[in-house]
Amino acid sequence: NTRKVVAWAKKKGVSVEAEIGAIAGIEDFVSVEEKDAHLTNPERALAFVKATKCDALAIAVGTLHGAFKFKGETVLDYDRIAAIKKLVRMPLVLHGASGISPELVERAKSQCSILGDCARLENAHGVSDEAIRKAVARGINKINIDSDLRIAFTAGVRETLMNDKKAFDPRKILGPARALMTEVVKHKMELFGSAGKA
């Protein structure tokens, strides 16, 4: 129960991010089908925040967990974000917001015949930069982009192993992956408006 977690965490000086609504996709081996997903109701969000006293609230406004989000354009409910922000007046979190860079997907898919099956990346498509900008403008404060970092890491490791078949030093294998992830993080910090704010 979220209320119990918040009470315990506050005693330890730890903040709690809670989630209301259900986001489709797979996260931490838990799968939610699109038919079972539901968007966050603003009034229920307010009641939830009052009841739990959480520090940040992750809301469901149309994103999906994982690398396979949309068949076409990103469709987020910006009015819902603004309505929730107006009521709860706390940091709002957007889960499942990876952009899934086509360039990095292609790099991760390179040499799939040797390093593994990448057919599942064929349909990878994420949340557009423009959609993120609009979500931030409406009140989103924290944005989760795990799939972007996984794809960058995978691309960096695969490229290194393909270019140097004798590589066995983890520092030389992981270094390029870390560098690609760093580039993604730099771009996202600019996009989110968080660059230079420590």
Name every feature range the model reports, one short phrase each.
Residues N1-L94, G99-R133, A137, E159, ...:
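Alpha/beta enzyme core
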Residues C112-C118, V127-A198:
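C-terminal alpha-helical cap/extension of soluble enzyme domains
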